[in-house]
Amino acid sequence: MVKLAFPRELRLLTPSHFTFVFQQPQRAGTPQITILGRLNELGHPRIGLTVAKKHVKRAHERNRIKRLTRESFRLHQHALPSMDFVVLVKKGVADLDNRALTEALEKLWRRHCRQAPAS
């Protein structure tokens, strides 16, 4: 049985982790969301989230976006390549309902799976 937990090891925690991804990212995006990815040597994917107050004014909206993004990652973690991902949100993401946001994330995860070099 596959575990679908979201432990600390699956998160980007320090600024150096984020900088690593920003240096040479593979990009996949929609008008509202961009997911940057870079291969890691850990054998499992990790995720970091950036939801700027500039783009999403209200805290409860930022929290909803982060919660749905973490849940999408948690459910897809075993299908994803061993990459570090940074999810960047843009203006207009707060206007997406939960279903549209989840579908956009699934589309971007599939795109990263196709772009990743076979290992």
Swiss-Prot record:
Molecular function terms, GO-annotated: 3'-tRNA processing endoribonuclease activity; ribonuclease P activity; tRNA binding
EC code(s) of this entry: 3.1.26.5
PROSITE patterns for the chain: RIBONUCLEASE_P (PS00648)
Example of a GO cellular component annotation carried by this entry: ribonuclease P complex
Keyword Cytoplasm listed: no
EC class: hydrolase
Keyword terms of this UniProt record: Endonuclease, Hydrolase, Nuclease, RNA-binding, tRNA processing
NCBIfam families associated with the record: rnpA
Family indicated by similarity: Belongs to the RnpA family.
Role summary: RNaseP catalyzes the removal of the 5'-leader sequence from pre-tRNA to produce the mature 5'-terminus. It can also cleave other RNA substrates such as 4.5S RNA. The protein component plays an auxiliary but essential role in vivo by binding to the 5'-leader sequence and broadening the substrate specificity of the ribozyme.
Protein name as catalogued: Ribonuclease P protein component
Protein species of origin: Yersinia pestis
